[in-house]
């Protein structure tokens, strides 16, 4: 999913896309922060192997992927 290094330009484009396609910028920012917090605690619990990527970067990539490819979501 996420390589060891996340390209900063790609990350910026993904973040801009999330904000641009949202109806509420504040809620999108809160969603990113909440997801990053979850990932940080998952790192502490040892549930995630990819600790080289910052949680906020991982959150932006995950939310962007969910937005762009909704067929990846379970259910």
Swiss-Prot record:
Q: Which UniProt keywords apply?
A: DNA-directed RNA polymerase, Nucleotidyltransferase, Transcription, Transferase
Q: Which GO terms describe its biological process?
A: DNA-templated transcription
Question: Its domain of life?
Answer: Bacteria
The EC designation for this entry is 2.7.7.6
Name any GO cellular component annotation: DNA-directed RNA polymerase complex
Q: What InterPro entries does the database record attribute to this sequence? A: DNA-dir_RNA_pol_omega, Pol_omega/Rpo6/RPB6
Name of one Pfam family that matches: RNA_pol_Rpb6
For this UniProt entry, the molecular function terms from Gene Ontology, in alphabetical order, are:
DNA binding; DNA-directed RNA polymerase activity
Q: Which reaction does it catalyse?
A: RNA(n) + a ribonucleoside 5'-triphosphate = RNA(n+1) + diphosphate
What job does the chain carry out?
Answer: Promotes RNA polymerase assembly. Latches the N- and C-terminal regions of the beta' subunit thereby facilitating its interaction with the beta and alpha subunits.
Oligomeric form and interacting partners: In cyanobacteria the RNAP catalytic core is composed of 2 alpha, 1 beta, 1 beta', 1 gamma and 1 omega subunit. When a sigma factor is associated with the core the holoenzyme is formed, which can initiate transcription.
Which protein family is it in? Belongs to the RNA polymerase subunit omega family.
Full protein name = DNA-directed RNA polymerase subunit omega
Its ancestry begins with: Bacteria, Bacillati, Cyanobacteriota, Cyanophyceae, Synechococcales
């Amino acid at each position: 999913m996420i390589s060891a290094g996340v390209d900063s330009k790609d990350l910026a484009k993904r973040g801009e896309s999330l904000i641009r396609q949202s109806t509420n910028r504040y809620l999108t920012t809160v969603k990113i922060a909440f997801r990053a917090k979850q990932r940080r605690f998952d790192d502490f619990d040892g549930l995630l192997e990819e600790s080289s990527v910052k949680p906020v970067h991982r959150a932006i990539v995950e939310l962007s992927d969910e937005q762009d490819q909704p067929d990846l979501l379970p259910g």
